[in-house]
Amino acid sequence: MYSSSRKRCPKTKWALKLLTAAFLAASPAAKSAVNNAYDALIIEARKGNTQPALSWFALKSALSNNQIADWLQIALWAGQDKQVITVYNRYRHQQLPARGYAAVAVAYRNLQQWQNSLTLWQKALSLEPQNKDYQRGQILTLADAGHYDTALVKLKQLNSGAPDKANLLAEAYIYKLAGRHQDELRAMTESLPENASTQQYPTEYVQALRNNQLAAAIDDANLTPDIRADIHAELVRLSFMPTRSESERYAIADRALAQYAALEILWHDNPDRTAQYQRIQVDHLGALLTRDRYKDVISHYQRLKKTGQIIPPWGQYWVASAYLKDHQPKKAQSIMTELFYHKETIAPDLSDEELADLFYSHLESENYPGALTVTQHTINTSPPFLRLMGTPTSIPNDTWLQGHSFLSTVAKYSNDLPQAEMTARELAYNAPGNQGLRIDYASVLQARGWPRAAENELKKAEVIEPRNINLEVEQAWTALTLQEWQQAAVLTHDVVEREPQDPGVVRLKRAVDVHNLAELRIAGSTGIDAEGPDSGKHDVDLTTIVYSPPLKDNWRGFAGFGYADGQFSEGKGIVRDWLAGVEWRSRNIWLEAEYAERVFNHEHKPGARLSGWYDFNDNWRIGSQLERLSHRVPLRAMKNGVTGNSAQAYVRWYQNERRKYGVSWAFTDFSDSNQRHEVSLEGQERIWSSPYLIVDFLPSLYYEQNTEHDTPYYNPIKTFDIVPAFEASHLLWRSYENSWEQIFSAGVGASWQKHYGTDVVTQLGYGQRISWNDVIDAGATLRWEKRPYDGDREHNLYVEFDMTFRF
């Protein structure tokens, strides 16, 4: 496989040093005090004078296990690999310390007996499984044996737990043996100290430059314009390669940006450097993209287009990626479709990153067929597992996992959340060590309205990499839903400090900033053509409330105004309310206390309200409301001087976004001695969902009874309504946080009233709703209803409206 000269050639010397240096510090004898002749021999051996110790060991017939391990290590230091093997074979049945087996493993490796070396590494690791030096020794030997993929997998596992420069050097060594010289150069570049000069370059880095045809970069005097452009291009390419952290990628990109700035000054007005100047202009797009400067990428691209410069495919891909990150998915989709489709078929050689960008360019452009095409292509062309060369071990195929992750995401965006959940759960539980899949699963649970279940899954994911950016972003979203305001703020502050340009972080920060704004709520209705006895003709009902920004996380103050009027046979009724109060929001709890000055019939009377709810879990909620001078008293009653106090309680059961039911009971004690009891049951059953259309069945039952009969307001002795309805929500347009939809509703049922029998109830409604930039949510609905009142069917045509505005 490899010639024996590789044993001592320069390209492997540093790997050998990496191991033996670790073993020098591992000898327990070296840690003891100099208190006898044996210790003195060991210390001399550590200084390089190994012969006295080796002679002493050779003359001894009885040695302890620790002394045997010392012999093996010192023989290794002396370069006597065969002697190490001979000593080991003599004592192989002894239970040696791990350092002894490690010394033998190094000796076998030096003799190119890879399998024997791997066996000894396994013995050493069985005794000290967390020893990073032994793990690296095994990894380097796997690379020597040609098992590059296995070595890289193990190195990735080691690096996730203990990233350091030694791991980068090991990575470069593996890539060098595998012939992947660009990856080798990337790893060596990352291992360099910042601002290293050419005189300080280590031998391995110089060799990596040579392997990448960049040897001239070693000598500044040999830097021709073409070579300088090559170096700039190579730095840009390296900045896109996966590394241990974003900061390393940024550091490489910053080197490229600094080189561009210098070369741009030199070549801008030099006609002899036109070709090289155009090259660095294109490569500059990539460096800006790595640095998350998406708007700069786009503006630089537009300047190049104006000059007529031709942009090669890789440059166009960088621009498309910038458009996608800058929330311009249709432009990204247009460029990527040209690049990655050939006669409506996806190119077969796309990387995982290219597939992901193509997928999201379709998805975020609301092109669901295109997203499904990419998904099916990814799944159909990728086996679930990859078998590593030269070993029976197989590992999960990241591309296959990505394809099924696409499947879950498409289902989620297509409003098929059960399918999204099933796919995401299967992926997460079949790959428990994959943190990204666990985070995706939690995101689907959150979308289904189960934030506590999502929180539990994120806790499991936290074990793998606690400070993963995507993990903390998802945890912050869950905290916002659970009203854990302080936790959300801490997580958001952390990710903003670390990755301020990350699109997920930008989106989260926007949500937290909006949460901290003041809020205006307006809601009401106005009658157009009404015959009903409750609200009168041409009635108006309006409530306006302003909430303060959050105070000490959980508190908000509010103040507002309410107005209601209606025309009755006995005259016009008008009620004005001036109100103020406080709101408390914390995990599982919402409370609101309000004081109101109610003005009607030329009188001022104090009213009050206390409302609240408590969540037991993701499924069950109980709530209650107590009100003095209740708004449950009809306007007509107040016109006639009748007021009342009320109490209400309810229970809500929420299975998921497709099914929920609520039961409520209300009691109103009128000032004219009437007592009203109301019980209602309302539910929702989703019967159809697609990307743009959702249809729900809305069953509704209502029962009411009153103790007084002869009153100036509508007051049936007993009444019972059954009015099932359907509601269809049709998405007209959507772009990220902005949307516009229309809502149709229709219901037909029956109403029974004591002494008046049963008659038909019909309802129709049409409305539109718009959401904009997270700060505006507004809608209006035209409703028509016809129902019996004391045996006469009367109609009511009115408009409902509401708006929430953050400022």
From Swiss-Prot:
TPR repeats: 98-131, 165-198, 279-311
GO molecular function: poly-beta-1,6-N-acetyl-D-glucosamine transmembrane transporter activity; polysaccharide transmembrane transporter activity
InterPro entries per record: PGA_export_porin_PgaA, PgaA_barrel, TPR-like_helical_dom_sf, TPR_rpt
Residue stretches in coiled coil: none
SUPFAM superfamilies (UniProt xref): TPR-like
Signal is among the record's keywords: yes
UniProt keywords, alphabetically: Cell outer membrane, Membrane, Repeat, Signal, TPR repeat, Transmembrane, Transmembrane beta strand, Transport
Superkingdom of source: Bacteria
First and last residue of the signal peptide: 1-26
UniProt cross-references to PROSITE patterns, sorted A to Z: TPR, TPR_REGION
Membrane topology according to the record: Multi-pass membrane protein
Subcellular location: Cell outer membrane
Null allele phenotype: Deletion of pgaA does not prevent PGA synthesis but does block its export. The synthesized PGA is retained in the periplasm and accumulates at the cell poles. Disruption of the pga operon causes severe and persistent defects in the biofilm formation process.
Entry's Gene Ontology BP terms: polysaccharide transport; single-species biofilm formation
Record keyword Ribosomal protein present: no
Database matches in Gene3D superfamilies: Tetratricopeptide repeat domain (1.25.40.10)
Record's note on what induces expression: Levels of this protein are negatively controlled by the second messenger ppGpp (at protein level) at a post-transcriptional level. Increased levels of c-di-GMP lead to decreased levels of PgaA.
GO terms for cellular component: cell outer membrane
Function text: Exports the biofilm adhesin polysaccharide poly-beta-1,6-N-acetyl-D-glucosamine (PGA) across the outer membrane. The PGA transported seems to be partially N-deacetylated since N-deacetylation of PGA by PgaB is needed for PGA export through the PgaA porin. Required for the synthesis of the beta-1,6-GlcNAc polysaccharide (PGA or poly-GlcNAc) that seems to serve as a biofilm adhesin.
Domain notes: Contains a predicted C-terminal beta-barrel porin domain and a N-terminal periplasmic superhelical domain containing tetratricopeptide repeats, which may mediate protein-protein interactions, perhaps with PgaB.
Protein name according to UniProt: Poly-beta-1,6-N-acetyl-D-glucosamine export protein
Gene source species: Escherichia coli (strain K12)
Gene responsible for this protein: pgaA
